[in-house]
Regions:
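C-terminal substrate-binding/catalytic lobe of Rossmann-fold NAD(P)-dependent dehydrogenases
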Residues: 143-152, 157-250
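N-terminal Rossmann NAD(P)H-binding glycine-rich loop of SDR-like oxidoreductase domains
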Residues: 8-12, 20
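Residues forming the Rossmann-fold NAD(P)(H) cofactor-binding site
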Residues: 17
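Rossmann-like NAD(P)(H) cofactor-binding subdomain of soluble oxidoreductases
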Residues: 96-165
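Conserved N-terminal Rossmann-fold NAD(P) cofactor-binding segment
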Residues: 25-80
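Conserved NAD(P)H cofactor-binding loop of Rossmann-fold oxidoreductase domains
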Residues: 87-89
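Redox-cofactor binding/interface segments in oxidoreductases and associated redox assembly factors
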Residues: 83-85, 127
Length: 250
């Protein structure tokens, strides 16, 4: 039997709630891998975390070995194999991701220092909390003993959004879209690039799409999709973000 430890910050939040059950479904790791799950959030969420713990127990996941609920980062991160830094101040209506930098910088700085002190030096870290790319850099700056290549920020949500919009445009299933790239930051300055994309292993679809749609519809829609969801839902992306973390992890 193999074991691995996974810590999730912001564990009482909507993204983590959607993510936890996908991870424990057992499809990421080998079937004989047992997960030591650590759920971390602020003290005010203690009651919520306990409720989530009860739900997890009720699922009777074969993949789950142990579960720890804590508000202490050093407990959550101790000897960890994987850390998902989901917890951060969320973006609300009218805010850009850059507005979150000052509010979240100290969170990721402090967590980085603790990770560097107590986690395995081989730990793999995925930064989800926005602005994810900046927060990942902050974590890197505070984890000198952990290789930079072990730390990544979430861009898969933008790629998934781009694939979905493109597949809808050409009338093909999203699984047929490959080699689509999103350059830049997880922000409105990102550049979804379909110049090398393929649909069913062919780039012939490019002949059916005009430049006006690419530059005036496709790219802005991907760039502003997060704001569009907030406008309609009143909250930032949760289930789609969790699904993207799962894809990134997988």
């Amino acid at each position: 039997m193999n074991k691995c430890s996974i810590a999730i910050t912001g564990a009482a939040g909507n993204i983590a709630y959607s993510l936890i059950f996908r991870i424990l479904s057992g499809s990421i790791f080998m079937p004989d891998t047992k997960i030591d799950l650590r759920l971390l959030d602020i003290p005010d969420t203690k009651k919520i975390l306990h409720g989530i713990k009860l739900e997890i127990e009720d699922c009777a996941f074969n993949s789950l070995d142990t579960i720890t609920v804590t508000d202490k980062p050093d407990v959550a991160f101790a000897d960890c194999d994987y850390i998902l830094l989901v917890g951060a101040k969320p973006r609300s209506k009218g805010m850009q991701r850059s507005d979150l930098i000052l509010d979240n910088a100290h969170i990721f700085s402090d967590q980085g220092k603790i990770i560097n002190k107590v986690s395995k030096k081989s730990v793999k870290i995925i930064v989800v909390g926005n602005p994810a790319n900046t927060n990942a850099l902050i974590v890197c700056s505070n984890t000198p003993d952990i290789p930079n290549e072990n730390i990544s920020s979430l861009m898969r949500l933008d790629q998934n959004r781009a694939k979905s919009i493109l597949s809808s445009k050409v009338g093909q299933h999203v699984s047929s879209v490959t080699k689509l790239v999103v350059w830049g930051n997880h922000s409105t300055t990102q550049y979804p690039d379909i110049s090398h994309a393929q649909i069913n292993n062919s780039n012939n679809f490019l002949d059916t799409i005009d430049e006006h749609w690419i530059h005036n519809d496709f790219i802005p829609r991907v760039q502003k999709r997060g704001a569009e969801i907030i406008e309609h839902r009143g909250l930032s992306s949760a289930a789609s973000a969790a699904s993207a973390v799962y894809d990134h992890f997988n």
